[in-house]
Amino acid sequence: MNALKNLSLILLLSLAFTGCHNKSSKINDFNLLLYAPEYASGFDIKGAGGKESVLITVRNPWQGADSVTTWLFIVRNGEEVPEGFAGQVLKGDAKRIVAMSSTHIAMLDAIGEVRCITGVSGIDYISNPDIQARRDSIGDVGYEGNINYELLLSLDPDLVLLYGVNGASAMESKLEELDIPFMYVGDYLEESPLGKAEWMVVLSEVTGKREKGEKAFAAIPVRYNALKKKVADSTLGTPSVMLNVPYGDSWFMPSTQSYVARLITDAGGRYIYQKNTGNASIPIDLEEAYLLASDADMWLNVGMANSLDDLKASCPKFTDTRCFKNGEVYNNNARTNTAGGNDYYESAVVNP
């Protein structure tokens, strides 16, 4: 009789323990901040007490987004998805990733996880040596609007990394239909150079290597701020800087709060166009652009030009500006591959 009572007690305790262990959590339980970005504004990573699963929140992941929030829940240790959760679900760490932007590749490379990439968009334009070395085994799924979903499905991805331009990616609905989880990466929207790089921490979380990602990122602000201080202590003066070339009859000038304007300031320069304090580039006419260029000490990011002769051919009127005459014209295309892929738009995100 005592043995039967003891057995019944053991069974009851076992059932009670199992019930507590498997009790479904609620999404509001995931309020423990695991990583709060210091420089980026578009994401955070949260957990819950006693849970190994995490919740990644991505805010306003495309231009013009207002109060848009997306979520990725990463299930770990056999835990359940919270009741009523309507976001994306990744079961375990991502081992097979399709990266739709070259910056995603650079971030995964920076944390030592580039070999998780099994699919890309536009492989010919990618600079990363590991991707090019494995190009025969990596699927090029094409570009948004013309995605090869049959190939994408055959890659058996755990996760697809997306980006939005002026709205949600057109891939969303098809990926949901195929039951392939996705996550938006909004690095390009960050105005801080360090904020862009900090998105590598998000990618380290989806691969189960957040500690590694935090360590890799931590070295970047140290190096960046040391260079910034060195420039600030310099007595070489503050050159005024003109940007870009015309697009049709307009010349687009970035905001003073933009990524490139901040790079200029941190490098000891003065961005010449101070009128645009908004959050997007604005067009000016060619006459105003000429007046700005005439006052500039340097001219950066001159489109497809590889030489002063190229620039002269595309902008003949601007050849009498001081920066042109002095040869103080610089482009960002020193590392361009044979297909025209520019590493500035790839690895520069993790090397500000």
PLM region spans:
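Extracytoplasmic/secreted envelope proteins and their assembly/folding machinery
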Residues: 91-94, 102-108, 149, 169-172, ...
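Structured C-terminal subdomain patch of bacterial secreted/periplasmic proteins
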Residues: 190-215, 301-352
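Flexible, glycine-rich surface segments
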Residues: 229-316
